[in-house]
Amino acid sequence: MKGLGDSRPRHLSDSLDPPHEPLFAGPDRNPYLLSPTEAFAREARFPGQNTLPGDGLFPLNNQLPPPSSTFPRIHYNSHFEVPEESPFPSHAQATKINRLPANLLDQFEKQLPIHRDGFSTLQFPRGEAKARGESPGRIRHLVHSVQRLFFTKAPSMEGTTGKVGGNGGKKGVLEDGKGRRAKSKERAKAGEPKRRSRSNISGWWSSDDNLDGEGGAFRSGPASGLMTLGRQPERTQPRYFMHAYNTISGHMLKTTKNTTTELTAPPPPPAPPATCPSLGVGTDTNYVKRGSWSTLTLSHAHEVCQKTSATLDKSLLKSKSCHQGLAYHYLQVPGGGGEWSTTLLSPRDMDSTAEGPIPCRRMRSGSYIKAMGDEDSDESGGGSPKPSPKTAARRQSYLRATQQSLGEQSNPRRSLDRLDSVDMPLPSKYPSWEEDYNPISDSLNDSGCISQVFGQASLIPQLFGHDQQVREADLSDQYEAACESACSEAESTAAEALDLSLPSYFRSRSHSYLRAIQAGCSQEEDSVSLQSLSPPPSTGSLSNSRTLPSSSCLVAYKKTPPPVPPRTTSKPFISVTVQSSTESAQDTYLDSQDHKSEVTSQSGLSNSSDSLDSSTRPPSVTRGGITPGPEAPEPPPKHAALKSEHGTLTSSESHSEAVPKRKLSSIGIQVDCIQPVPKEEPSPATKFQSIGVQVEDDWRSSAPSHSMSSRRDTDSDTQDANDSSCKSSERSLPDCTSHPNSISIDAGPRQAPKIAQIKRNLSYGDNSDPALEASSLPPPDPWMETSSSSPAEPAQPGACRRDGYWFLKLLQAETERLEGWCCQMDKETKENNLSEEVLGKVLSAVGSAQLLMSQKFQQFRGICEQNLNPDANPRPTAQDLAGFWDLLQLSIEDISMKFDELYHLKANSWQLVETPEKRKEEKKPPPPVPKKPAKSKAAVSRDKASDAGDKQRQEARKRLLAAKRAASVRQNSATESADSIEIYVPEAQTRL
């Protein structure tokens, strides 16, 4: 139960986001450091108004000293403050408490003096240095269990809480959300032992501490105070909220699960103040205790959820004035507790609300951290399993939706809530809160703002990176549970408001790419919303989700791509890849679908749905490619956004402003769904060839370049033909006019170059380094160019048959290549003061090349001309030409090796590097001079030596010729199939 209690404190942190109203009526009431023995006399601040007495009613045994965990649940009056700290009473307590009807809890709450210190500082004596194994995930489980199972499985929930915190925060959350049961139990069981023992600076458990322990991101106890709804900064002041925020979240949610209807009914949403008494957000109180947060109704839960996300963003910013100085950053929502309290639906909602901020944190600790390898994830990783990508996606989408629609619509902001628990549309107040929230989130965009709001930069990463992910994800799940049980109708309303099918967006996650390609992303606006929701893979990802906590999660999530691997620069455009299109992108997609899919997409945010859109709209690829190109640098900002959330948010915002630049990173397909503007830059699309997905537009516009690239691939065999291979391949198109297909036109030239190049490679074995050849060598395949000049070539079918023209082309290419090498070496000798040895090598290579060109090349040229002359007698056949060419290849290979060595020397600043072989040879003693034998013996030995040398040379030549013939056969077959290959590649890319 203590573990649960700690989890509860996490709820406190969950409720970190304050309601719009000042969470605390005023710091007039100092945080009550209720000793565990001290009855949790509710402060007057939290009078019976807390309609959700569950929080306050349920003693947070964890918060209470060890005895407090044992004190009867009925001691709610006395223990309410501490219970706030304890998210969940001890199993027995929690179970009993949860079993208490909402009315009973309300009565208890009323009976108890409510400390209206608010959540300012839920500092509970840490008499028990409890291992706070509860992580956001674990608390999430507790909340879910409380919401759905705690009333029935309070003990198991508590046990589960520990587990959740330690192990399956994410799983537990998801499972708790779906079957808040066994895992909750397991977590409660493991939670106690796993609970992190947090040494709070004050020595008291603060709501932040609870959050920290459970949120992981909020582990820093005092710093955790940041999550404290109470504005009061006295971190050292232990504050007990008479209605344990977490208790209500957990216990009330548990009871709420049972009595959610009861709680909701007894404290009807219309009387949010009554429902909010626990909130302390009641109209009478500006400070909302965590308990009150948990008490927040579903509407408040939505608000809180989003606001809690915003709490980091808006609430923190709004409470920034309060927070900056606060030891415990009391998140104060300018909107006023009234809105929140008025929107209160049920303790469960309150719990969800309490978790509102935590979903983001949970998300951050969860999928986001997973993807990002967030430091926060490390903090809370052990304590709380990270929320599943879905949860993270939900939270992200929620954040994005909230960001997008905070100003525009409250529901979109609730997208996360909707995604998590599509149970209620936020009240109109919530939108106003969202509006406030947006500025806050904007302010929070800067990590400085965040640190200001939270007072600890270190906390911020934790909050945003991990706890928010985990907690927000958990809260999302918990919120789902609470909303489901408490606000099914609100859920339907929210679903309607969402206009999203949660399943669909989940499906879109898994099938976003297919959807984009197949459906063409008819939901451009959805994809746009995804883009906006999940800002462009670059920093923009946060732009729409101004809610820094959640948006930073999103950004981090996408940035996580860096950890996950942000895609390449082009991939950043591929929001899906970066964005975990399966998760946040789709959540975002659904969310933004509702309200801001278009707006968000305009915001330049690219989501998986965005990429889906781009995928579906291959023509947009050019735009997408173009757009991503400009934004390709942004992906680093995206990571930067992870680093500096404000920066990311800023980028996102700027992206949102530049809708046309929206990065459409369809999965592997760069397509700009919504932005025709990116079409302006079709050239970048070609850049995406590396992606392997080329949109038809790009292919059509850059088909030659594609074929060129293919050619280059083939030519890459002969790296020396880099530049000229393109030219020659283009020229070879005419040369190989025989290739009927325009595509194969490129292919044809490639085929010829391929053959020649392949032969060349085989013969010279890549005589020169690709880099050297590309930069310093003459056009690699001039022969290909000559092929264009040979009109007879077109007659040849696709294979560019090897006749005189073919070999003349090869000869011309080789001649130009060798001449280029010679010229290059001449320049080098003139420009550089080469050593005699190097100069000798240069002269040797150049002389050999010139000799080869002047003699053998000329001879071969004559043979080729004879072959082309039908009247020639004898007329050499193609086989004769091929055989002679193979012989030439031996010489060309030797010369190529020499030039290759020269280029290596050049790369080495013309410094001779003795190879081990040479050294060995030098070291090897000269062969012993045979003693002068008889002349006859000497003659015999000479004959034998000459014979042996001749045999070796002949064998080597035979091997070379055999290898060359085999290579020639391979080249021929490749050339013959070049057309189909060439056609196939473009088709495949076009299909993509």
Swiss-Prot record:
GO terms for biological process: modification of postsynaptic structure; modulation of chemical synaptic transmission; regulation of synapse maturation; signaling. Expressed in brain. Its main location: membrane. Coiled coil: none annotated. One of its GO terms (cellular component) is cholinergic synapse. Keywords: Membrane, Methylation, Phosphoprotein. It is found in: Membrane. GO terms for molecular function: molecular adaptor activity; protein domain specific binding. The modification Phosphothreonine is found at residue 915. Interacts with DLG1 and DLG4/PSD-95. May play a role in the molecular organization of synapses and neuronal cell signaling. Could be an adapter protein linking ion channel to the subsynaptic cytoskeleton. May induce enrichment of PSD-95/SAP90 at the plasma membrane. Belongs to the SAPAP family. This is Disks large-associated protein 4.
